[in-house]
């Protein structure tokens, strides 16, 4: 059984997890081509290898939407209301159009179903009425689907993770300032080991948690 260990002491975000998984692939350049071939509309995916302390190097993802690069650490505003809102059905429609194995599609859908359920509990409304903010944007869909595709390609059968560092302080969202972890993220982390810190910023995002 192939087991993956994730050190999440500094949190978990979709783009960072995708870069970490890509670093494990024997041919990252070929894998980036497969990620691009998923066919997320208007999206260009590239990656570069960067120095990473004394341990060596790591892959950093670059996602461009219609020629504009999204902020790689957009978890700072994943709850922002300054973005086009995407419904659960809207995200599912995008996933249904992607050129990916059904098994990968099902895993990506499961991630978004978990997010929708957590948002439903946090806001006290039916899942059908949930509107995703940043997590419904195309770069987040790339993060989620890309991670699911990489896990399948790498033939990972079991994932073990350290306690997840969630950060601290507050995060700004459409409903004002919320403590970290935000309510929806806290629901997503139920059953998992997590810890406050390090620092006073949001380290575990609504996409990183369910992934």
Regions found by a protein language model. Give the residues of each.
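General beta-strand structural signal in soluble alpha/beta enzymes
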Residues: 6, 127-134, 160-163, 196-198
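Conserved phosphate/anionic-ligand binding catalytic regions in large, soluble enzymes, centered on
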Residues: 6-20, 132-155
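Alpha-helical transmembrane cores and adjacent cytosolic helix/loop segments
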Residues: 116-134, 138
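Phosphate-handling active-site elements
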Residues: 24-33, 152-162
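Extreme N-terminal starter segment of soluble prokaryotic enzymes
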Residues: 1-4
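Mobile "lid/hinge" segments at catalytic clefts and subdomain interfaces of large enzymes
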Residues: 156-211
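Acidic, glycine-rich active-site loops and adjacent beta-strand->loop/helix elements
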Residues: 9-10, 37-39, 51, 136-138, ...
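Glycine-rich nucleotide/cofactor/substrate-binding loop typically near the N-terminus or early
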Residues: 23-123, 182, 191-209
């Amino acid at each position: 059984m192939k087991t993956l260990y994730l050190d999440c002491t500094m949190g978990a975000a979709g783009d960072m997890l995708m870069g970490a998984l890509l670093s494990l692939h024997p041919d990252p350049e070929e894998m980036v081509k497969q990620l691009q071939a998923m066919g997320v509309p208007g999206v260009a995916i590239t990656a570069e290898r960067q120095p990473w302390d004394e341990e060596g190097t790591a892959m950093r993802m670059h996602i461009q939407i219609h020629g504009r690069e999204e902020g790689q650490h957009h978890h700072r505003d994943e709850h922002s209301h300054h973005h086009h809102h995407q419904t659960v059905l809207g995200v599912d429609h995008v996933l249904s159009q992607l050129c990916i194995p059904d098994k990968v599609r099902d895993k990506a859908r499961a991630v978004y179903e978990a997010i929708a359920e957590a948002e439903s509990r946090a806001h006290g409304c039916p899942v059908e009425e949930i509107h995703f903010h940043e997590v419904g944007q195309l770069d987040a869909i790339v993060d989620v689907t890309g991670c699911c595709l990489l896990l399948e390609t790498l033939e990972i059968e079991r994932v073990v993770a350290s306690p997840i560092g969630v950060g601290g302080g507050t995060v700004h969202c459409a409903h004002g300032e919320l403590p970290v972890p935000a309510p929806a993220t806290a629901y997503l982390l139920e059953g998992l080991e997590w810890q406050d810190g390090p620092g006073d910023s949001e380290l575990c995002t609504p996409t990183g948690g369910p992934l």
